[in-house]
Amino acid sequence: MLDERGALARGAAEAIRAGYEAYQAERARITARARGRFEARDWAGAQRDARERLDLRDGVVHRTVGEVRAELGGAVQDREVWRRAKEAFEAVAAARPDAEIAGSFFNSVTRRVLTTVGVDPAIEFLAADAPPPREDPPQHRAFAREATTEALLARILRAAPISAPFEDLARDARLAALELDAHVRGLPDRQPIDAVELARPVFYRGKGAYLVGRIRRGRHLTPLVLALAHGDRGVALDAVLFTEEDVSIVFGFTRSYFHVALERPRAMVAFLSTLLPLKRRSELYTGLGYHKHGKAELYREVAQHLAEGDDRFVPARGDRGLVMCVFTLPGLDVIFKVIRDRFAPPKQTTRREVMDRYRHVFRHDRAGRLVDAQEYEHLAFPAARFSPALLEELRTECGDGVRVAGGEVAIRHLYAERRVTPLNLFVREADEWTARQAVLDFGCALRDLAATDTFPGDLLLKNFGVTRHGRVIFYDYDELTRVTDCNFRDLPGAGPGDGDDGWGGGPDAGYDGGDPPFYVGPADVFPEELLPFLGLTGRLREVFLRAHGELLTGRWWRDIQARLRAGEIVDIFPYREEQRLRHAHP
């Protein structure tokens, strides 16, 4: 029997190894297309590649699960076979430069087959199973100092592995040098640049290409990102970023994933950690496109926090959600969302529709405004680590998917996201200047979302949040829809020009906000009526209207619809407009 189990285990391990190698080969093929898409300015193709790569892993795992079931037959639930399969898989995967990613793939297969609740270290790879760090070859190329910063940057740009011609490389090097020299002069130590160390592969995402690295000045390291754009007249250096905050936003949790050719993901994460020491490993892996391994790393970070601390899960700050029970650990900037069994009025959505919207966000361009949500199934946590009030809420409101027994809380399905400050609380608690900036960025967030065909549906401030960098993001997806699926209408009697007074809906609009004396379809949206839902009053209301009043007109939304339907892909940069070189130095 032992020999038979061993043979079955080796067969299962081989099937999973073959599945993983097929996945990695196809993933590498899709990722390698990013350079050609950028050089050809094929932005629609880049979007298709992004969706194809996002869908790839689940398809390969599903196929591999079928092959493993066929291989194991009646022994498919035999945990001794799976324990030995893990050992056999580890023996062949340990020497791989991407061993940690391979381990997460193995875990996905085992959890899909066995529906494990919690984590079973006998048949799953944990952080403790990772092989000892090897001496990886350098992930960067060093460019020693030149006579001038301009000459150094010109050499870097000429060496970039991009075949498309630059519009004006000398100009870009000169403008970037002005920015970089001014930054270095402003540092307390004023130590000159010794070298620039750039990651060997180019990081591609959307319409951008990024040279990512660091500036070495003696013992000091400063992050550096050179953001490239490809316009009608050629490639141009669009921005140079050299603060941890700016580079962190480029790698933010509201961005879509990079397409970057990597053989050694762990080594690249280690390199990026020198630029962004506050970024968790889970976020870096996710940003590099290894979202499933990033999800596994996040779970390990939560487990480590629970093991080392004594804080308890408590309800998250903010208004109580009608669709989700939301909770957090005070000492960890992560929130957890569990879908309620029933939704209180006026919510009319279903559990399946909510999950479909989260899936849509996962596959969509998040434009720096939609929080990346990691989806988990069959997790278990110690019941003693839940506050009594939260435990009671989970029992009574989420009982269909939550079971409390044996000292554990088993949760069938949840989402985990980075914790942010709800916008309604932020503007209430911040000083006036900071609140004004948040309201201005709230309008920018609505514009960015619209440009990527996203309409939040529910525009209450409580559904938006503010990151530690002060950026406004959207995190409540239960009413999210496509802009192109909406019918943006003007209120009857709004006046000439599609209600272009900017913010109709008052007495002059001919409608007092009660039951409308005209037909309203399920997809109809009246932008003139959105202002009361925003909950802005006084000076903050005035600030929003002055900067973003056109968002309250049907004309603006119909114009963006027309652009989207025509196939336009709008530029959205992971940096401020004033940071673009030609704006900083016209």
Curated annotation (Swiss-Prot):
**What Pfam families does the annotation carry?**
AceK_kinase, AceK_regulatory
Primary localization: cytoplasm
Q: Could you state a single Gene Ontology molecular function term?
A: ATP binding
This one is known as: Isocitrate dehydrogenase kinase/phosphatase
Query: Which species expresses this protein natively?
Result: Anaeromyxobacter dehalogenans (strain 2CP-C)
UniProt-listed Enzyme Commission number(s): 2.7.11.5, 3.1.3.-
Annotated ATP binding sites: A316, R317, G318, D319, R320, G321, L322, K337
Report the GO terms under cellular component: cytoplasm
Disulfide bond positions? none
Give the protein's function. Bifunctional enzyme which can phosphorylate or dephosphorylate isocitrate dehydrogenase (IDH) on a specific serine residue. This is a regulatory mechanism which enables bacteria to bypass the Krebs cycle via the glyoxylate shunt in response to the source of carbon. When bacteria are grown on glucose, IDH is fully active and unphosphorylated, but when grown on acetate or ethanol, the activity of IDH declines drastically concomitant with its phosphorylation.
Q: Does the keyword ATP-binding apply?
A: yes
Q: Which family does it belong to?
A: Belongs to the AceK family.
Name the catalytic site residues: D372
Subcellular locations according to the entry: Cytoplasm
Kindly state which reaction or reactions the protein catalyses: L-seryl-[isocitrate dehydrogenase] + ATP = O-phospho-L-seryl-[isocitrate dehydrogenase] + ADP + H(+)
